[in-house]
């Protein structure tokens, strides 16, 4: 209860400061609710991807974590993190997947051999959760 009151008080102060600049924060929040945000896959697993179990970037990652000790370790855990974020962030959003986040069924696939079929489970999951998907090829930390 005290935390909620503190947040409400902080928002009221911020709202007054923005109003002094002619900004209606309630209108801004309503507009923001109509702007899709693309949540990047690497925010939940420190850019490891799912090419190989326990993958890490050569040179390290960015220390982003999800709802698991260290980082999401599986596609299931990363999807759960995406779903939780989607529940907490108002509006309709998208996920952004790099090629290294393919669902390879446990078999290694070279990046130059990845096909759309490697993302079918992601497509089905996103559709069932009302999310769009943006795609990035992965041209770093890999020879091919």
Predicted segments with their positions:
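Alpha/beta catalytic barrel-like cores
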Residues: 2-144
């Amino acid at each position: 209860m005290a935390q909620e009151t503190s947040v409400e008080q902080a928002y009221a102060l911020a709202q007054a400061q923005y109003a002094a600049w002619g900004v209606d924060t309630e209108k801004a929040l309503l507009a923001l609710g109509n702007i899709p945000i693309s949540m990047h896959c690497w925010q939940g697993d420190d850019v490891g991807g799912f090419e190989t179990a326990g993958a890490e970037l050569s040179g390290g990652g960015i220390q982003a974590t999800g709802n698991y000790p260290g980082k999401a370790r599986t596609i299931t855990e990363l999807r759960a993190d995406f779903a939780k974020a989607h529940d907490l962030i108002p509006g309709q959003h998208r996920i952004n997947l790099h090629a290294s986040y393919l669902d390879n069924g446990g078999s290694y696939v070279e990046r130059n051999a990845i096909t759309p079929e490697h993302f079918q489970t992601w497509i089905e999951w996103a559709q069932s959760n009302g999310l769009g998907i943006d795609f990035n090829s992965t041209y770093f930390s890999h020879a091919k």
